[in-house]
Amino acid sequence: MQVAIPETMKAVVIEDGKAVVKEGIPIPELEEGFVLIKTLAVAGNPTDWAHIDYKIGPQGSILGCDAAGQIVKLGPAVNPKDFSIGDYIYGFIHGSSVRFPSNGAFAEYSAISTVVAYKSPNELKFLGEDVLPAGPVRSLEGVATIPVSLTTAGLVLTYNLGLDLKWEPSTPQRKGPILLWGGATAVGQSLIQLANKLNGFTKIIVVASRKHEKLLKEYGADELFDYHDIDVVEQIKHKYNNISYLVDCVANQDTLQQVYKCAADKQDATIVELKNLTEENVKKENRRQNVTIDIIRLYSIGGHEVPFGNITLPADSEARKAAIKFIKFINPKINDGQIRHIPVRVYKNGLCDVPHILKDIKYGKNSGEKLVAVLN
Protein backbone atom coordinates (compact mmCIF):
# COMPACT_ATOMS: atom_id res chain seq x y z
CA MET A 1 0.00 0.00 0.00
CA GLN A 2 1.37 3.36 -1.03
CA VAL A 3 0.60 6.56 0.86
CA ALA A 4 1.04 9.98 -0.70
CA ILE A 5 3.72 11.90 1.20
CA PRO A 6 4.35 15.60 0.57
CA GLU A 7 7.85 16.96 -0.06
CA THR A 8 7.70 19.40 2.84
CA MET A 9 5.88 19.77 6.14
CA LYS A 10 5.18 21.99 9.12
CA ALA A 11 7.46 21.55 12.15
CA VAL A 12 8.58 23.28 15.35
CA VAL A 13 12.24 24.25 15.09
CA ILE A 14 14.81 26.14 17.12
CA GLU A 15 15.22 29.64 15.77
CA ASP A 16 16.99 32.52 17.54
CA GLY A 17 16.65 30.87 20.93
CA LYS A 18 12.95 30.09 20.62
CA ALA A 19 10.60 27.33 19.50
CA VAL A 20 9.12 28.49 16.19
CA VAL A 21 6.50 26.85 13.98
CA LYS A 22 7.67 26.84 10.36
CA GLU A 23 6.35 25.61 7.02
CA GLY A 24 8.38 24.16 4.16
CA ILE A 25 10.55 21.84 6.25
CA PRO A 26 11.82 18.77 4.34
CA ILE A 27 10.40 15.36 5.25
CA PRO A 28 13.07 13.43 7.23
CA GLU A 29 15.06 10.73 5.45
CA LEU A 30 14.81 7.20 6.79
CA GLU A 31 17.86 5.45 8.19
CA GLU A 32 18.09 1.67 8.40
CA GLY A 33 15.42 0.25 10.69
CA PHE A 34 13.33 3.43 10.77
CA VAL A 35 9.76 4.08 9.63
CA LEU A 36 8.05 7.35 8.76
CA ILE A 37 4.88 8.21 10.63
CA LYS A 38 2.24 10.80 10.02
CA THR A 39 2.33 12.38 13.44
CA LEU A 40 -1.03 12.51 15.22
CA ALA A 41 -0.15 13.41 18.81
CA VAL A 42 2.96 14.68 20.60
CA ALA A 43 3.89 15.30 24.22
CA GLY A 44 6.25 17.80 25.79
CA ASN A 45 9.18 17.03 28.10
CA PRO A 46 11.58 19.22 30.10
CA THR A 47 14.41 18.21 27.76
CA ASP A 48 12.63 20.04 24.91
CA TRP A 49 12.97 23.52 26.37
CA ALA A 50 16.41 22.59 27.77
CA HIS A 51 17.64 21.90 24.23
CA ILE A 52 16.78 25.51 23.43
CA ASP A 53 17.86 27.31 26.59
CA TYR A 54 21.14 25.43 27.05
CA LYS A 55 21.96 25.60 23.34
CA ILE A 56 22.11 21.81 22.99
CA GLY A 57 20.05 21.72 19.79
CA PRO A 58 21.35 23.26 16.53
CA GLN A 59 19.63 26.21 14.90
CA GLY A 60 16.87 25.04 12.59
CA SER A 61 16.65 21.58 14.15
CA ILE A 62 13.25 20.00 14.81
CA LEU A 63 12.27 19.72 18.47
CA GLY A 64 10.38 16.99 20.31
CA CYS A 65 10.89 13.51 21.75
CA ASP A 66 7.42 11.94 22.29
CA ALA A 67 5.45 11.12 19.13
CA ALA A 68 2.52 8.91 18.19
CA GLY A 69 1.11 8.33 14.74
CA GLN A 70 0.46 6.06 11.79
CA ILE A 71 3.14 4.49 9.61
CA VAL A 72 3.18 5.86 6.06
CA LYS A 73 6.54 4.53 4.83
CA LEU A 74 8.96 1.73 5.73
CA GLY A 75 12.67 2.43 5.70
CA PRO A 76 15.54 0.08 4.76
CA ALA A 77 15.76 -3.24 6.65
CA VAL A 78 12.32 -2.96 8.26
CA ASN A 79 10.56 -6.33 8.30
CA PRO A 80 7.04 -5.85 6.87
CA LYS A 81 5.89 -8.77 9.03
CA ASP A 82 6.65 -6.68 12.12
CA PHE A 83 5.62 -3.23 10.89
CA SER A 84 3.25 -2.33 8.08
CA ILE A 85 1.96 0.85 6.52
CA GLY A 86 -1.12 1.85 8.47
CA ASP A 87 0.11 0.53 11.84
CA TYR A 88 -0.24 2.82 14.86
CA ILE A 89 3.03 3.22 16.75
CA TYR A 90 4.58 5.56 19.28
CA GLY A 91 8.17 6.08 20.26
CA PHE A 92 11.09 8.15 21.49
CA ILE A 93 12.87 10.48 19.08
CA HIS A 94 15.94 12.54 19.92
CA GLY A 95 14.56 15.85 18.73
CA SER A 96 16.98 18.69 17.92
CA SER A 97 19.94 16.34 17.83
CA VAL A 98 23.24 17.35 16.27
CA ARG A 99 23.41 14.06 14.37
CA PHE A 100 19.89 14.09 12.90
CA PRO A 101 18.60 17.69 13.16
CA SER A 102 15.98 17.12 10.45
CA ASN A 103 13.99 14.73 12.65
CA GLY A 104 11.92 15.44 15.74
CA ALA A 105 8.55 14.64 17.27
CA PHE A 106 7.12 18.13 16.77
CA ALA A 107 6.49 17.76 13.07
CA GLU A 108 3.77 16.57 10.72
CA TYR A 109 5.99 13.60 9.83
CA SER A 110 8.61 11.92 12.04
CA ALA A 111 11.08 9.06 11.67
CA ILE A 112 10.98 6.44 14.46
CA SER A 113 13.38 3.57 15.06
CA THR A 114 11.40 0.34 15.00
CA VAL A 115 13.64 -1.42 17.52
CA VAL A 116 12.57 0.99 20.26
CA ALA A 117 9.02 1.67 19.05
CA TYR A 118 5.82 0.73 20.84
CA LYS A 119 3.03 -0.70 18.71
CA SER A 120 -0.71 -0.70 19.21
CA PRO A 121 -2.63 -3.77 17.97
CA ASN A 122 -5.68 -1.64 17.26
CA GLU A 123 -6.58 1.59 15.53
CA LEU A 124 -6.00 4.53 17.84
CA LYS A 125 -8.38 7.47 17.91
CA PHE A 126 -8.66 10.82 19.64
CA LEU A 127 -10.89 10.98 22.68
CA GLY A 128 -11.43 14.70 22.10
CA GLU A 129 -11.39 15.68 25.77
CA ASP A 130 -9.53 18.66 27.25
CA VAL A 131 -8.33 16.63 30.23
CA LEU A 132 -7.82 12.89 30.63
CA PRO A 133 -7.50 11.20 34.02
CA ALA A 134 -4.92 8.45 34.44
CA GLY A 135 -6.16 5.35 32.67
CA PRO A 136 -5.55 2.51 30.20
CA VAL A 137 -3.44 3.47 27.19
CA ARG A 138 -6.04 3.25 24.41
CA SER A 139 -6.13 6.68 22.76
CA LEU A 140 -3.76 8.82 20.73
CA GLU A 141 -3.61 11.34 23.57
CA GLY A 142 -2.69 8.55 25.97
CA VAL A 143 0.00 6.80 23.93
CA ALA A 144 1.81 10.09 23.27
CA THR A 145 2.62 10.29 26.99
CA ILE A 146 4.39 6.93 27.10
CA PRO A 147 7.73 6.74 25.22
CA VAL A 148 10.11 9.01 27.12
CA SER A 149 8.68 8.51 30.61
CA LEU A 150 8.03 4.77 30.59
CA THR A 151 11.21 3.86 28.70
CA THR A 152 13.27 5.95 31.11
CA ALA A 153 11.57 4.30 34.09
CA GLY A 154 12.15 0.86 32.63
CA LEU A 155 15.86 1.54 32.13
CA VAL A 156 16.26 2.97 35.64
CA LEU A 157 14.85 -0.19 37.22
CA THR A 158 16.44 -2.80 34.95
CA TYR A 159 19.63 -1.25 33.55
CA ASN A 160 20.65 0.94 36.50
CA LEU A 161 19.20 -0.95 39.46
CA GLY A 162 19.33 -4.45 38.01
CA LEU A 163 15.75 -5.67 38.42
CA ASP A 164 14.62 -8.64 36.37
CA LEU A 165 11.69 -8.31 33.99
CA LYS A 166 9.36 -10.50 36.04
CA TRP A 167 5.69 -9.51 36.24
CA GLU A 168 4.20 -9.63 39.74
CA PRO A 169 6.64 -12.11 41.32
CA SER A 170 5.58 -13.36 44.75
CA THR A 171 8.55 -11.95 46.67
CA PRO A 172 10.36 -8.60 46.35
CA GLN A 173 13.44 -8.67 44.13
CA ARG A 174 15.39 -6.42 46.54
CA LYS A 175 15.42 -6.61 50.34
CA GLY A 176 14.98 -2.91 50.97
CA PRO A 177 12.80 0.07 50.00
CA ILE A 178 13.17 2.46 47.09
CA LEU A 179 12.78 6.24 47.37
CA LEU A 180 11.39 8.14 44.38
CA TRP A 181 11.86 11.89 44.76
CA GLY A 182 9.36 13.52 42.42
CA GLY A 183 6.80 10.73 42.44
CA ALA A 184 4.22 12.82 40.60
CA THR A 185 6.51 13.63 37.67
CA ALA A 186 5.88 11.72 34.47
CA VAL A 187 8.88 9.45 35.08
CA GLY A 188 7.94 9.14 38.76
CA GLN A 189 4.42 7.94 38.00
CA SER A 190 5.83 5.39 35.56
CA LEU A 191 8.42 4.24 38.09
CA ILE A 192 5.81 3.63 40.78
CA GLN A 193 3.74 1.45 38.47
CA LEU A 194 6.73 -0.55 37.26
CA ALA A 195 8.35 -0.94 40.68
CA ASN A 196 5.02 -2.24 41.94
CA LYS A 197 4.35 -4.65 39.06
CA LEU A 198 7.93 -5.98 39.09
CA ASN A 199 7.75 -6.29 42.90
CA GLY A 200 11.17 -4.74 43.00
CA PHE A 201 11.38 -3.53 46.59
CA THR A 202 9.92 -4.06 50.06
CA LYS A 203 8.39 -0.57 49.97
CA ILE A 204 7.88 2.21 47.44
CA ILE A 205 8.43 5.53 49.21
CA VAL A 206 7.63 8.68 47.23
CA VAL A 207 8.24 12.37 47.73
CA ALA A 208 5.56 14.50 46.10
CA SER A 209 2.84 17.02 46.84
CA ARG A 210 0.18 15.68 49.19
CA LYS A 211 -2.47 16.47 46.53
CA HIS A 212 -1.19 13.55 44.44
CA GLU A 213 -1.26 10.99 47.26
CA LYS A 214 -4.45 9.17 46.23
CA LEU A 215 -3.32 8.56 42.64
CA LEU A 216 0.23 7.59 43.55
CA LYS A 217 -1.00 5.04 46.07
CA GLU A 218 -3.37 3.64 43.45
CA TYR A 219 -0.27 3.03 41.32
CA GLY A 220 1.39 1.16 44.18
CA ALA A 221 3.20 3.73 46.34
CA ASP A 222 3.28 2.68 50.00
CA GLU A 223 4.07 5.99 51.65
CA LEU A 224 4.23 9.64 50.62
CA PHE A 225 6.26 12.46 52.12
CA ASP A 226 5.35 16.01 51.09
CA TYR A 227 8.29 17.98 49.70
CA HIS A 228 6.62 21.19 50.89
CA ASP A 229 7.49 20.23 54.48
CA ILE A 230 10.66 22.03 55.53
CA ASP A 231 11.81 18.98 57.47
CA VAL A 232 10.92 16.40 54.80
CA VAL A 233 14.44 14.93 54.74
CA GLU A 234 14.46 14.63 58.53
CA GLN A 235 11.06 12.92 58.42
CA ILE A 236 12.34 10.36 55.94
CA LYS A 237 15.62 9.72 57.78
CA HIS A 238 13.82 9.35 61.11
CA LYS A 239 11.69 6.54 59.72
CA TYR A 240 14.04 5.03 57.13
CA ASN A 241 17.81 5.05 57.57
CA ASN A 242 18.33 2.07 55.28
CA ILE A 243 17.36 3.31 51.81
CA SER A 244 19.84 1.86 49.33
CA TYR A 245 17.89 2.60 46.13
CA LEU A 246 16.96 6.18 45.29
CA VAL A 247 15.85 7.95 42.11
CA ASP A 248 15.87 11.72 41.68
CA CYS A 249 13.05 12.28 39.20
CA VAL A 250 13.24 16.08 39.52
CA ALA A 251 16.99 16.15 38.98
CA ASN A 252 18.26 19.58 39.89
CA GLN A 253 20.98 20.81 42.24
CA ASP A 254 18.61 21.17 45.19
CA THR A 255 16.87 17.81 44.86
CA LEU A 256 20.23 16.05 44.45
CA GLN A 257 21.33 17.37 47.85
CA GLN A 258 18.06 16.25 49.44
CA VAL A 259 18.04 12.80 47.88
CA TYR A 260 21.70 12.30 48.81
CA LYS A 261 20.93 13.00 52.47
CA CYS A 262 18.16 10.37 52.37
CA ALA A 263 20.56 7.60 51.32
CA ALA A 264 21.46 4.85 53.80
CA ASP A 265 23.95 5.89 56.47
CA LYS A 266 26.15 2.78 56.39
CA GLN A 267 25.27 0.27 53.67
CA ASP A 268 25.98 0.92 50.01
CA ALA A 269 23.41 3.11 48.28
CA THR A 270 22.79 4.03 44.63
CA ILE A 271 21.14 7.25 43.47
CA VAL A 272 19.95 7.35 39.87
CA GLU A 273 19.92 10.83 38.33
CA LEU A 274 17.96 11.71 35.20
CA LYS A 275 20.33 14.54 34.28
CA ASN A 276 24.09 14.89 34.12
CA LEU A 277 24.56 15.37 37.88
CA THR A 278 27.43 13.57 39.62
CA GLU A 279 29.25 13.44 42.97
CA GLU A 280 30.91 16.71 41.94
CA ASN A 281 27.52 18.41 42.28
CA VAL A 282 27.09 17.24 45.88
CA LYS A 283 28.31 19.63 48.57
CA LYS A 284 31.75 18.46 49.70
CA GLU A 285 30.80 18.26 53.36
CA ASN A 286 27.95 15.85 52.53
CA ARG A 287 29.80 13.40 50.28
CA ARG A 288 30.05 9.81 51.51
CA GLN A 289 31.97 6.82 50.20
CA ASN A 290 29.00 4.47 50.51
CA VAL A 291 26.81 6.49 48.12
CA THR A 292 27.16 6.13 44.35
CA ILE A 293 25.45 8.31 41.75
CA ASP A 294 24.46 6.67 38.47
CA ILE A 295 23.01 8.48 35.46
CA ILE A 296 20.42 7.34 32.96
CA ARG A 297 20.53 8.99 29.54
CA LEU A 298 17.76 7.91 27.22
CA TYR A 299 19.69 9.46 24.34
CA SER A 300 22.28 6.68 24.63
CA ILE A 301 19.90 3.97 23.35
CA GLY A 302 20.32 5.03 19.72
CA GLY A 303 23.41 2.90 19.23
CA HIS A 304 25.78 5.75 18.34
CA GLU A 305 27.71 8.61 19.94
CA VAL A 306 25.56 11.61 20.81
CA PRO A 307 27.03 15.13 20.71
CA PHE A 308 25.24 16.83 23.59
CA GLY A 309 26.13 20.42 24.37
CA ASN A 310 29.78 20.59 25.41
CA ILE A 311 30.10 16.81 25.86
CA THR A 312 29.67 13.73 23.70
CA LEU A 313 27.71 10.84 25.15
CA PRO A 314 29.32 7.52 24.19
CA ALA A 315 27.34 4.84 22.42
CA ASP A 316 25.94 2.48 25.05
CA SER A 317 25.18 -0.91 23.54
CA GLU A 318 24.08 -2.37 26.89
CA ALA A 319 21.56 0.42 27.49
CA ARG A 320 20.27 -0.08 23.95
CA LYS A 321 19.84 -3.83 24.54
CA ALA A 322 18.08 -3.12 27.84
CA ALA A 323 15.69 -0.67 26.17
CA ILE A 324 14.84 -3.11 23.36
CA LYS A 325 14.26 -5.91 25.87
CA PHE A 326 12.12 -3.71 28.12
CA ILE A 327 9.89 -2.42 25.30
CA LYS A 328 9.35 -5.94 23.96
CA PHE A 329 8.38 -7.04 27.49
CA ILE A 330 6.15 -4.11 28.46
CA ASN A 331 4.34 -3.46 25.15
CA PRO A 332 1.82 -6.32 25.66
CA LYS A 333 1.23 -5.14 29.24
CA ILE A 334 0.35 -1.69 27.91
CA ASN A 335 -1.99 -3.20 25.33
CA ASP A 336 -3.68 -5.25 28.07
CA GLY A 337 -4.33 -2.16 30.19
CA GLN A 338 -1.92 -3.17 32.95
CA ILE A 339 0.06 0.07 32.63
CA ARG A 340 -1.79 3.38 32.85
CA HIS A 341 -0.95 6.67 31.19
CA ILE A 342 -0.64 9.56 33.62
CA PRO A 343 -3.16 12.45 33.69
CA VAL A 344 -3.14 14.40 30.42
CA ARG A 345 -3.90 18.02 29.54
CA VAL A 346 -4.71 18.31 25.83
CA TYR A 347 -3.85 21.25 23.56
CA LYS A 348 -6.00 21.24 20.44
CA ASN A 349 -4.25 23.65 18.06
CA GLY A 350 -1.68 21.14 16.88
CA LEU A 351 1.93 22.17 16.45
CA CYS A 352 0.99 25.81 16.99
CA ASP A 353 0.47 24.95 20.67
CA VAL A 354 3.93 23.43 21.14
CA PRO A 355 5.74 26.70 22.06
CA HIS A 356 3.02 27.26 24.69
CA ILE A 357 3.47 23.71 26.01
CA LEU A 358 7.22 24.18 26.37
CA LYS A 359 6.71 27.40 28.34
CA ASP A 360 4.15 25.73 30.59
CA ILE A 361 6.58 22.89 31.34
CA LYS A 362 9.50 25.26 31.90
CA TYR A 363 7.54 27.29 34.44
CA GLY A 364 6.07 24.29 36.25
CA LYS A 365 2.47 24.47 35.08
CA ASN A 366 2.26 20.72 34.47
CA SER A 367 2.04 19.38 38.03
CA GLY A 368 1.31 15.67 37.91
CA GLU A 369 0.26 15.66 34.26
CA LYS A 370 1.62 15.34 30.75
CA LEU A 371 0.95 18.08 28.19
CA VAL A 372 -0.12 16.73 24.80
CA ALA A 373 -0.82 18.46 21.48
CA VAL A 374 -3.09 16.71 18.98
CA LEU A 375 -2.60 17.11 15.23
CA ASN A 376 -6.00 16.65 13.58
From Swiss-Prot:
Taxonomy, superkingdom: Eukaryota
Stored CDD domains: enoyl_reductase_like
GO molecular-function terms, A-Z: oxidoreductase activity, acting on NAD(P)H
Gene3D superfamilies: Medium-chain alcohol dehydrogenases, catalytic domain (3.90.180.10), NAD(P)-binding Rossmann-like Domain (3.40.50.720)
Pfam family for this entry, one: ADH_N
PANTHER family, per database record: HYPOTHETICAL OXIDOREDUCTASE (EUROFUNG), ZINC-TYPE ALCOHOL DEHYDROGENASE-LIKE PROTEIN C2E1P3.01
Other observations noted: Present with 799 molecules/cell in log phase SD medium.
Family note: Belongs to the YCR102c/YLR460c/YNL134c family.
Name assigned to this protein: Uncharacterized protein YLR460C
Organism annotation: Saccharomyces cerevisiae (strain ATCC 204508 / S288c) (Baker's yeast)
